[in-house]
Amino acid sequence: MRFLVTMHMPSYSGNLVHQMNVEHKSTSLEEFVDALSKEDFVVVEEFYRDPTTGSDNSRGMTAINHRYVGKIKVINQHR
C-alpha cells in the first residue's frame, strides 16, 4: 500500500520537514501504524514523481524511524 509520510527532518532541498512517497506491505493505514510502532525502523520502498512524465519512479528500499514521523496519509493509487 502507498503512503505519504511527513517526517520531522530536513528535506533534500533544505525544508524543515520531509515528505516521502513510500510503499509498504501493509493493507491499511492502521496496519502500517502498527508496524511502525513495533520497531524503531521500518523498511519501505521510496518513490518520487518525475516532473516530466508524471510517473512514480523507485528510489529503492529505505528504512524510516517512527520517532521522526509526524503524519501519514494513504495515497490513492487509482487516479
Task: State where each predicted segment sits.
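Acidic, Ser/Thr- and proline-rich intrinsically disordered linker/docking segments
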Residues: M1-D40, G70-R79
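Short, mixed-charge low-complexity intrinsically disordered segments
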Residues: E39-R79
